[in-house]
Every structure is written in C-alpha cells, then in structure tokens.
Amino acid sequence: MAKDNIHPNWYPEAKVYCDGQLIMTIGSTKPELHVDIWSGNHPFFTGSQRIIDTEGRVERFMRKYKINKN
C-alpha cells in the first residue's frame, strides 16, 4: 500500500537529449534529461577508443628502477 503524496511523479515519455539533439525516450522521474555522453558517441561503443599513454608507463617504470631493455 503506497502512501499518498510522497512518491515522485513518473514520466513514461521522458526525453533524453545530448548536445541539444533528441536521443531517446525513457521512463524517468524527470521530464527531460540532458546527458554529455551516451552509447552513440562514447569511444568504447563507437570503436574509436584510443589508448592514451603520454609518457609511456613501462618506459617510466624501467627508467625509475634503472632496468635495461635486453
């Protein structure tokens, strides 16, 4: 038995926007959701993911502990 007037409103057609563009509609407690990243533009899901290794962790480790590559 749910209590009256304590539960948030449910919006079954809440709109999700990314960069001002409508992405999808979902059920939510807010009528509109604005997101920065979603599966359509996330590098992992789009296949454009790059491994960023600015200094080279292995090289930095080897230099720190004075290990020579053979």
From Swiss-Prot:
Q: Does the keyword Chloroplast apply?
A: yes
| GO biological process per UniProt | translation
Lineage: superkingdom: Eukaryota
The yes or no answer to whether the keyword Nuclease is present is no
Q: Where does the protein end up?
A: Plastid, Chloroplast
Principal cellular location given in the protein's record: plastid
Signal peptide limits = none
Similarity annotation: Belongs to the bacterial ribosomal protein bL31 family. Type A subfamily.
Q: Name one GO cellular component term.
A: ribosome
What keywords tag this UniProt record? Chloroplast, Plastid, Ribonucleoprotein, Ribosomal protein, RNA-binding, rRNA-binding
> What role does it play?
Binds the 23S rRNA.
UniProt name for this protein: Large ribosomal subunit protein bL31c
Q: Which GO terms describe its molecular function?
A: rRNA binding; structural constituent of ribosome
Q: Which SUPFAM superfamilies match?
A: L28p-like (SSF143800)
State how it assembles: Part of the 50S ribosomal subunit.
